[in-house]
Amino acid sequence: MSSQVNTTRDSRRKILQGIVVSDKMQKTIVVQVERKSKHRLYKKLVITHKKYHAHDEKEECKIGDFVEIMETRPLSATKRWRLNKIIQKAK
């Protein structure tokens, strides 16, 4: 499965895609987003990961799901993203 990142602006809100790595909190998921960039000097492809806490109102995500999250107003100390849609369910 390709975990390609698409960062676009839809009505000035960022949209990211990633894999759910934790769903242990109530109405909260942790999504790991992968970014690929070239090193400036060595021109090697560098892969970096970042984890985002996202709001899952219906608690429908499970670990391993490929999801799309959208930027939103601050919901807690760490949550500034919400689940937009589930692209692919985990097997």
From Swiss-Prot:
One of its GO terms (molecular function) is rRNA binding. The keyword Ribonucleoprotein applies. Keywords: Ribonucleoprotein, Ribosomal protein, RNA-binding, rRNA-binding. GO terms for biological process: translation. PANTHER family: 40S RIBOSOMAL PROTEIN S11 FAMILY MEMBER (PTHR10744), SMALL RIBOSOMAL SUBUNIT PROTEIN US17M (PTHR10744:SF1). Part of the 30S ribosomal subunit. This is Small ribosomal subunit protein uS17. It comes from Malacoplasma penetrans (strain HF-2). The gene is rpsQ.
